[in-house]
């Protein structure tokens, strides 16, 4: 199946081929793109982090289990949303999965609507996360355009210091502080000190 950057993809990992096929048929019926794998090892052989996506993952898999894989992803800060499927309905296991950020924990075979609802939530979560990451990268790129002195002034403004206080702290005139603050706001495209403070907080 062809996967492009603007398509959301549901990655299905389950060692039961018939069950995988049934999920593909369900998701295809509502226009969702899918890629299927019989094990974590097969999944790792592909690039599954470049598009808006989620994982539908069997808890008990040959080799690395679903929960172990979730823990490994967390260690590498890979935040792809996961929906766990289990034939056992293990409550302690589901609690552990949810604490690590799983979207849902469903008993196999799941109700079609329950699975579709969970996938909708998961894909929106991933889409929102990616948009936030792009915005943060763009903001940090803008901050690179500031001079060291401008970054210093910006940091002090964000801490709530007045121009006079900043001038005293830096050993410069108040007019110089106003100039640097104006340049910072111009470069970052903000119109008020409140917006500047918010932008500083987002970049941290």
Show which residues each predicted segment covers.
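Helix-turn-helix DNA-binding segment
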Residues: 137-175
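Active-site residues of response regulator receiver
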Residues: 58, 86
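Short amphipathic alpha-helix used as the core "switch/output" element in two-component signaling
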Residues: 45, 67-79, 96
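C-terminal output helix
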Residues: 90-92, 106, 110-120
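Non-catalytic signal-transmission and effector/linker regions of two-component phosphorelay proteins
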Residues: 1-11, 17, 24, 138, ...
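Acidic, metal-coordinating helix/loop segments flanking the phosphotransfer/catalytic sites
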Residues: 36-54
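Basic, Lys/Arg-enriched C-terminal extension of HTH/homeodomain DNA-binding domains
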Residues: 185-204
């Amino acid at each position: 199946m062809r996967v492009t950057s603007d398509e959301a993809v549901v990655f299905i990992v389950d060692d039961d081929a018939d069950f995988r096929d049934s999920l593909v048929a369900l998701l295809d019926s509502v226009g969702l793109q899918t890629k299927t794998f019989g094990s974590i090892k097969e999944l790792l052989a592909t690039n599954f982090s470049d598009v808006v996506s989620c994982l539908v993952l069997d808890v008990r898999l040959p080799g690395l289990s679903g929960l172990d894989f979730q823990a490994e992803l967390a260690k590498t800060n890979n935040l792809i949303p996961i929906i766990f499927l289990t034939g056992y309905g293990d409550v302690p296991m589901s609690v552990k999965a949810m604490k690590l950020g799983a979207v849902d924990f469903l008993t196999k075979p799941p109700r079609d609507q329950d699975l579709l609802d969970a996938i909708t939530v998961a894909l929106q979560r991933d889409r929102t996360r990616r948009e936030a990451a792009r915005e943060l990268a763009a903001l940090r790129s803008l901050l690179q355009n500031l001079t060291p002195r401008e970054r210093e002034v910006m940091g002090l403004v964000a801490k709530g210091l007045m121009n006079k206080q900043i001038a005293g702290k830096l050993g410069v005139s108040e007019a110089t502080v106003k100039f640097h603050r104006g340049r910072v706001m111009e470069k970052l495209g903000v119109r008020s000190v409140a917006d500047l403070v918010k932008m500083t907080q987002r970049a941290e």
